[in-house]
């Protein structure tokens, strides 16, 4: 479904900030670049799930709509029947889904942590082991904790609100060099007797050259989400129907990429055990009893591959979606039925991203010439592609109420679902 594709494209806006470690070099500039990568990763890990959480809820609720209408399923038929149609869903974005409170990555200083980065000879006081890049990163997170939560609270300001993938407007984390300098000098290691001057100078230089702005990119300013999917229902065998949804792998262009969607479901009649005349019916045209009850389970999957953005981020994403519901319908006569149902649904999205540092960070680090998005002489750009795996999950309880009307071989369906993400659904089905 296109909603899943929109989710994956939206997350790249923030995911391209994620860095990875590179081999430590001997210049402060290289340490600054490495710190920028690590801190960008921290920002994403602290805020990425909050940024995308409303979209995951939306996909879960929308993808798990328009499975059922009439609960009537004949126990046996003279020959198989088919319902072929298009099911469309319109979801509404509420204000609480458009923003979240961003988090500044930080870590409180603990002397016991230092053994991970640095080792000393107790007798001589000499350094025997040193991971400079990781030590700088650790100290930097200590500084963020001090500036946001510690004794120097206020030197680093965290934005009060940021846009989710459904909201709008970028949010910037501002890291003034003056504040960073004060926080480094206030760090316990700054005056630690065994801290060599060369290491202190290296850390100070790396921090001084550090970018002053990191951006959490805004969303797509969505007030509603629309999706449609072809659906086939085949029945019946022992009061059971088969549901099939399918969009074969197709290239939807530069914006979406290569996308595929499929689903399989089984619906079983409970009414056949309640109505004596249910087993004798040899057609599916219209229920003969006032009410019917059925239970249904559906499993769906999606996949997406795309290359997006100036930095050519490669995206691969797959989702598995489950739904189980109990629903009933009431025969009003004349081809009209009212129905309602309650369902439990779950989604898991596994994504892999391969990308480079954002262009604006590369400008601040001197990797790219200001205003240019491609390497030029003396400005090689980010040469180290990074890869990150992310997993998103959501569960939902949904109540649906609707009406279906049959006109000859054409059936129209309209319903509304209430849950964490409300959905209005419409179906148009041809029966044969």
Q: Which sequence ranges carry the predicted segments?
A:
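Short loop/turn motifs that connect adjacent beta-strands in outer-membrane beta-barrel proteins
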Residues: 72-80, 95, 254, 272-293, ...
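Residues that define the transmembrane beta-barrel architecture of outer-membrane proteins
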Residues: 78-80, 223-228, 257-264, 289, ...
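Outer-membrane beta-barrel translocator/channel fold
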Residues: 280-284, 289-331, 345-349
């Amino acid at each position: 479904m296109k909603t899943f594709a929109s989710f994956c494209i939206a997350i790249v806006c923030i995911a391209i900030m994620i860095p990875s470690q590179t081999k430590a070099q001997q210049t402060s500039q290289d340490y600054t670049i490495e710190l920028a990568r690590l801190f960008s990763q921290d920002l994403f890990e602290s805020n990425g799930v909050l940024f995308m959480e409303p979209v995951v809820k939306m996909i879960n609720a929308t993808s798990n709509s328009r499975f059922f209408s009439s609960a009537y399923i004949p126990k046996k038929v003279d020959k198989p029947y088919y319902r072929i149609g298009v099911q469309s869903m319109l979801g509404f974005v509420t204000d609480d889904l458009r923003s979240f409170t961003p988090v500044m990555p930080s870590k409180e200083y603990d002397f016991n942590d230092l053994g991970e980065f640095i080792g000393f000879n107790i007798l001589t006081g000499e350094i025997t082991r040193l991971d400079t890049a990781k030590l700088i990163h650790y100290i930097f997170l200590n500084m963020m904790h001090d500036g946001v939560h510690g004794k120097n609270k206020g030197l680093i300001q965290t934005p009060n609100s940021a846009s989710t993938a459904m909201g709008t407007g970028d949010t910037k984390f501002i890291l003034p060099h003056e504040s960073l300098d004060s926080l480094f000098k206030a760090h316990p290691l700054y005056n630690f007797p065994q801290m060599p001057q060369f290491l202190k100078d290296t850390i100070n230089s790396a921090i001084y050259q550090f970018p002053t702005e990191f951006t959490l990119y805004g969303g797509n300013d969505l007030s509603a989400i629309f999706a449609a999917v072809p659906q086939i229902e085949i029945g019946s065998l022992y009061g059971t129907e088969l549901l099939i949804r399918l969009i074969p792998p197709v290239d939807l262009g530069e914006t979406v990429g290569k996308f595929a969607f499929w689903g399989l479901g089984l619906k079983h009649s409970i009414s056949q055990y309640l109505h004596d005349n249910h087993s004798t019916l040899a057609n599916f045209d219209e229920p003969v009893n006032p009410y019917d009850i059925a239970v249904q389970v559906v499993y769906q999957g999606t996949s997406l591959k795309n290359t997006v953005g100036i930095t050519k981020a490669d995206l691969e994403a797959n989702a598995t979606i489950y739904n189980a519901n109990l629903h009933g319908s009431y025969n009003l006569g004349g081809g009209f039925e009212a129905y309602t149902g309650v369902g439990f649904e779950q989604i898991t999205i596994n994504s892999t991203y391969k990308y480079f540092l954002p262009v604006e960070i590369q400008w601040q680090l001197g990797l790219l010439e200001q205003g240019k998005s491609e390497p030029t002489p003396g400005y090689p750009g980010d040469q180290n592609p990074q890869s990150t795996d992310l997993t998103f999950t959501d569960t939902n309880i949904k109540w649906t109420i609707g009406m279906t009307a049959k006109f000859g071989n054409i059936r129209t369906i309209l319903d509304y679902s209430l849950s964490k993400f409300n959905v209005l659904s419409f179906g148009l089905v041809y029966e044969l």
